[in-house]
Amino acid sequence: MTDDLTGALTQPPLGRTVRAVADRELGTHLLETRGIHWIHAANGDPYATVLRGQADDPYPAYERVRARGALSFSPTGSWVTADHALAASILCSTDFGVSGADGVPVPQQVLSYGEGCPLEREQVLPAAGDVPEGGQRAVVEGIHRETLEGLAPDPSASYAFELLGGFVRPAVTAAAAAVLGVPADRRADFADLLERLRPLSDSLLAPQSLRTVRAADGALAELTALLADSDDSPGALLSALGVTAAVQLTGNAVLALLAHPEQWRELCDRPGLAAAAVEETLRYDPPVQLDARVVRGETELAGRRLPAGAHVVVLTAATGRDPEVFTDPERFDLARPDAAAHLALHPAGPYGPVASLVRLQAEVALRTLAGRFPGLRQAGDVLRPRRAPVGRGPLSVPVSSS
């Protein structure tokens, strides 16, 4: 552990990829880093509270960050912002990258899976399959419709089912497999690998269990091999990882809509509002809650001089509720005229190249649900994951169709 001149108590980076580190060293690193996050959270640091990932609702912690000004320093060693204007300038600037010099993680980046992890690479070009028009849209719509009809064949009957496991995850995964050309006999493997990779984005900033990290590392290698025959295998890999974001986005959208019944009824009456529902969800409760950057060279930010290697975190979810930009930001509103001013799934972010496909999957899922089950309602408690400060979405949502 190190205590630098800024007062930050941090863990030194591993300096090697997950695969190159023995279980004992990796496990110790994960436990000690998580302990540091708990200490800082207990001492009142809101960003450490976010990293700890124990709250169902992280938005109160985001507001505590906002109250500290446009840019504040966390004792975890990161500079943090919830300010929309500042965040936009960071995300669009070439002064910031995804890792330190020569691709080496900085201390605030808990671990590295190496060059094979698309979330640790600069994203420049659209990923494979990220052209959501024409034939691909038809494929996605057909698979979503078939999945829901298989779950609930009689639209006039009453059904109780788990939204994510029963419909959203199978439909989104199957549609992605079809778009990416995964062989039919490997699609069950594809789905299993994506489930093991669900905590991948969280694990880069928030320590997971040793078993979870090992499972994700192995799944990343297996998925890379599975997609190796793609015309653009790196892009295909990123597109596959976008499945998690699409599932989370859909889950967040449905929860927001069902919590505002008049908005759900509006969507059922006007299915064309599905795209607006997706954009408002991206503002209100996005699937990727934050985006981390590393300063490439000494720079000034919000009146502060930041050295090369400084770690800067954009709380994307918080910027979507910035009262300086959005009127009544705590209200979910399908008619909001400026919802698309959010910074979620930013083109320069890790999921930027697959943002169109993520949006398409969520839009189609909402249209399909609203068209078949206008009486849909939540029928039980929502289950959410822990240690998930980056990816936000429910694990389980019991619903009833009547």
Curated annotation (Swiss-Prot):
UniProt pathway: Antibiotic biosynthesis
Keywords: Antibiotic biosynthesis
One GO term (biological process): antibiotic biosynthetic process
Transmembrane segment boundaries: none
Any one GO molecular-function label of the UniProt entry: oxidoreductase activity, acting on paired donors, with incorporation or reduction of molecular oxygen
Family as reported in the entry's similarity comment: Belongs to the cytochrome P450 family.
Subunit structure comment from the entry: Forms a complex with DesVII.
NCBIfam families for the chain: P450_rel_GT_act
Note in the entry: EryCII, OleP1 and DnrQ are able to replace DesVIII, however the total amount of glycosylated compounds is significantly reduced.
Cross-referenced PANTHER family: CYTOCHROME P450 YJIB-RELATED, P450, PUTATIVE (EUROFUNG)-RELATED
Protein name: Protein DesVIII
Source organism per UniProt: Streptomyces venezuelae
Lineage start: Bacteria, Bacillati, Actinomycetota, Actinomycetes, Kitasatosporales
